[in-house]
Amino acid sequence: EPLWAHYKRIIKDNGAIVLTASQPFTSALVMSNIKMFKYDWVWNKKKGGSPLLSKIQPIRISEDVVIFGKGKLFYNPIMTPRDKPVSRGKNKGNISETTNNAFTKDKVYTEYYPKNIIEISNADQNNRVHPTQKPVALFEYLIKTYTHEGELVLDNCAGSGTTAIACLKTNRNYILIEQETKYCDIANKRIAEFIP
């Protein structure tokens, strides 16, 4: 409750609160503020999980990304290219290179909207410096999806500073909060190494 009160106080009306979790914590997280819950993504890590548990349960290679907000969220869908353009309309056999065919008024689609599964490998975890460290690419994706360039991103569980690196790569400002001095030092070092 106290954390939600702070989130409500500082979040913009169209801002997103983006939290990562795994079951059973995901369910508890959603139920802790069902009123602000919007939806979730599944992050397919493609690698990971504990092989020690593989004989009693499936190896977990996914994690939940849970989205909360006050109102209608800013959402910038990150499109993925189609292998072949698809035309929709009366004359859908006619495909042009432009997004709108001037002659047939058909809409030509060259991209897909995102699905709720984010496919970003976490294979480079050999160099991780925090037990729950996420790939920079995952945070870049989420930051681009829910913010404009120049906006401010808060990470109140900053760990090794991955959010800061993703913000620097996507031209966003950031505030990091981390309670363990060891990880503050690691985050500062990573940021200093990234900034030219």
Where are these regions (language model features)?
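Core catalytic lobe of class I
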Residues: 1-186, 194
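Conserved hydrophobic residues forming the short capping helix/wall of the S-adenosyl-L-methionine
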Residues: 191
